[in-house]
Amino acid sequence: MTVRVAALVLGAGLLLAGCGSAQGAGSLVTGTSAPATPTSSVAPPPAELLAQARLEPCPASDPTVPPVADGLPDLTLPCLGAGPAVRLAGLRGTPYVVNLWASWCKPCRAELPLFAALDAATPEVALLGVDVEDDPASAVSLLVASGVHYPSVRDDSRATRLPLRWTGLPMTLFVAADGVVQHVERAPITSQAQLDGLVERYLGVTVPS
């Protein structure tokens, strides 16, 4: 391989690592590995900032239900705000929109108000953020600025990267009530109409206009 070709290959890899990959469901490595609870030494956000954010508590998740094929990975992640740690593979009983984001990710910042509007308009669908390798105080400050009140968990060590096969953020998963991932959006969502349409198409829930 010539130096020029090697440089082009390296540049393409860096581009993919810096932003979401092409739209599509892709393949997930889920439902087959042993349960994991990543360790973290990251300090939680300040209590006064959490009080200002008024985040909903993280949802309860079933610790005993077996993971499903093509479901969320069997990872237990700490809550960014109040509430228990969340076992992703144990989220059942309601459709979920799960958004991987970070305060350092520019397209993620643009998406958050869209998810906040969906959360306010559609109680039949639960939203959960996964804040990736972020400063918790910066993350909560962004949620305040974006009007987000739905909960997020913290992925301080990028534990979701291998099972969900993501190369960049944001990434959004549409998960049915039985825990099966119906669709993975690997590119930024750029409009409310696009997000609402994805919810209606893959979760079967009509979003009020």
Locate the predicted segments by residue.
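Structural microenvironment flanking redox-active thiols in thiol-disulfide oxidoreductases
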Residues: 109-146, 156-162
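Soluble periplasmic/extracytoplasmic beta-strand elements of cell-envelope proteins
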Residues: 76-78, 129, 173, 183-184
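N-terminal targeting signals for export/organelle localization
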Residues: 1-78
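Short active-site neighborhood of thiol/selenol oxidoreductases, capturing the structured segment around
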Residues: 86-109, 115
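Residue-level recognition of short loop/turn positions
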Residues: 18, 81-82, 178
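A short beta-strand-turn-helix
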Residues: 66-69, 74-96
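Thiol/disulfide oxidoreductase modules built on the thioredoxin-like
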Residues: 141-148, 155-209
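Hydrophobic alpha-helical membrane segments, chiefly transmembrane helices and signal peptide h-regions
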Residues: 6-18, 100, 114, 130-132, ...
